Amino acid sequence: MENPFEITNVIAREILDSRGNPTVEVEVYTPISMGRAAVPSGASTGTHEALELRDGGSRYHGKGVRRAVENVNKIIAPEIIGMDVTWQRDIDTLMLELDGTENKSNLGANAILGVSLAVAKAAANALGLPLYQYIGGTNAYVMPVPMSNVINGGVHAGNELDFQEFMIMPVGADSFREAIRWVSETYHVLKKVIMEKYGRNAVNVGDEGGFAPPMKEVTEPLDVLIKAIEEAGYKPGDEIAFALDAASSEFFDGEKGKYVVAGKEYDKGELLELYRELVTTYPIVSIEDPFHEEDWEGFVMITKELGSKVQIVGDDLFVTNPKRIRKGIEMGAANALLLKVNQIGTLSEAIDAAYTSFRAGYGVVVSHRSGETEDATIADLAVALNAGQIKTGAPARSDRNAKYNQLIRIEEELEGIAVYPGKKFRNPFL
């Protein structure tokens, strides 16, 4: 009798992401199920991220992924066909061995991750389980508080704002459904407020669905957000708080050793002072990448100074890499991890990174990339890990809303059990 969990076929193809760039999609088949996964891609990437294989040449302006697709079809597929689809860690480990490099540059993290996620989905489908339950077991019931990126700057936008993301967090809501309603209502009022102040062209949206008005000073978006939240009928801070992603590797001048914000140069002490002022003036509860990816000292300073009242998130600092996370934990750099599955390249390693962080008392924010697809795996992953936080853009563009809509479905499925952590997003179990 055939094993219903045996992998019978693996197919990879090139598809388009939300920016119109090629990315990898993989399907894994068993006699009784199929799992499909599409791989996201970032714009502001940390230098220590696992390598995304691109073809170069003129096709798709060099961004084609035919090599990665071929690596799945010709190298990975023959090795995993015949394996049990529920052997997630064995399959992930085998792919790492096949690749043989530290940063997955041989087969490509985009090839490996596509297979890793498709395997998990095929296994969940074979067992008749939702993905969050397959990964997280019966204890997966914490809904994430959304960090919704409603005003964009940095490399995600064409304006002069140096900070990359200005996000709202509905910490006062009672459920995920209520939270997403608050975000949506605020987003629509924000559009009106921006249009009144900056004109019609200012409400074009960026890669992640947020607005990119012609702002320069970092206080401008925060003032506009306060106004929008109040006009939407909510209390800034108490009901809807702010989160920032400075993405400061992008505005660090390596030659001068200075950070350049709104045309002004700051050393790390002065930049820390700017963050302190912002946190004192506005209801900011989380700051991501406040210093550049090698400024461990800056991260230690801000964590000591502000970490008791503000979440300090490492993205480019950690790149979801357990080695770098352990270094941060030892030094006291940051107190939360931004978890991006494609930064590390397999589901098993991403889960390890999350648990390494949890054990040290760090928060975990499950995150999208700026180049996304309709794949909603990260919604299930956020619930599977009981992470309590998700960062997946504004409530606009289907590539972002695919994740929010999946979370609405999951909360409905967990009716009576689901917990929305609200202000306890950093540690839902406290």
UniProtKB/Swiss-Prot annotation:
One of its GO terms (biological process) is glycolytic process. It catalyses: (2R)-2-phosphoglycerate = phosphoenolpyruvate + H2O. (2R)-2-phosphoglycerate binds at residues 164, 340, 369-370, 391. GO terms for cellular component: cell surface; extracellular region; phosphopyruvate hydratase complex. Binds a second Mg(2+) ion via substrate during catalysis. It is an enzyme of class 4 (lyase). The keyword Cytoplasm applies. Pathway: Carbohydrate degradation; glycolysis; pyruvate from D-glyceraldehyde 3-phosphate: step 4/5. It holds the Pfam family Enolase_C. Its EC number is 4.2.1.11. One of its GO terms (molecular function) is phosphopyruvate hydratase activity. Disulfide bonds: none annotated. Its main location: cytoplasm. Keywords: Cytoplasm, Glycolysis, Lyase, Magnesium, Metal-binding, Secreted. The active site is at residues 208, 340. Mg(2+) binds at residues 245, 288, 315. Its cofactor is Mg(2+). Catalyzes the reversible conversion of 2-phosphoglycerate (2-PG) into phosphoenolpyruvate (PEP). It is essential for the degradation of carbohydrates via glycolysis. NCBIfam families: eno. Belongs to the enolase family. This is Enolase. It comes from Thermococcus kodakarensis (strain ATCC BAA-918 / JCM 12380 / KOD1). The lineage of its organism: Archaea, Methanobacteriati, Methanobacteriota, Thermococci, Thermococcales. The gene is eno.
